Amino acid sequence: MTVIKIKKINDFKYNKLKFKKVYFLKTELASILNIYSRNVSRGIWKDYSLDCNHNSAIFSIYKSSFERAVLEIHKKKVSNGFEFLIIKNKKIIYTSKDLSKVLLQTEKIPKIIN
């Protein structure tokens, strides 16, 4: 019986390594939060959330805590690295492998003002 338990533990470790979550790097998150804080100080954005799973990391931006996300920045796992997306109203607005290019596009998107 102990052999079976060891095998289950090893299977768990294998699955854990196989399905590693995607996260924003510290520098990527700092860049996103820099843009976010600028827009919060202007009164355009009010709240954010982070979500991570096995194939993408999502930074969602809200006008209010009670509404749907106004804008989402996705870091998506692709076959040869990662890809960054801007999604607004469930539509892909911009895609790039370079986060700085994606963040420049957030400045061009019309802002939602009260």
Where are these regions (language model features)?
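Intrinsically disordered, low-complexity regions enriched in small/polar residues
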Residues: 14-16, 38, 50, 61-64, ...
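Amphipathic, interaction-prone secondary-structure segments
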Residues: 45-72
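Short aromatic-glycine-(Arg/Gly/Cys) micro-motifs in beta-strand/loop hairpins
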Residues: 4-10, 15, 66-92, 108-109
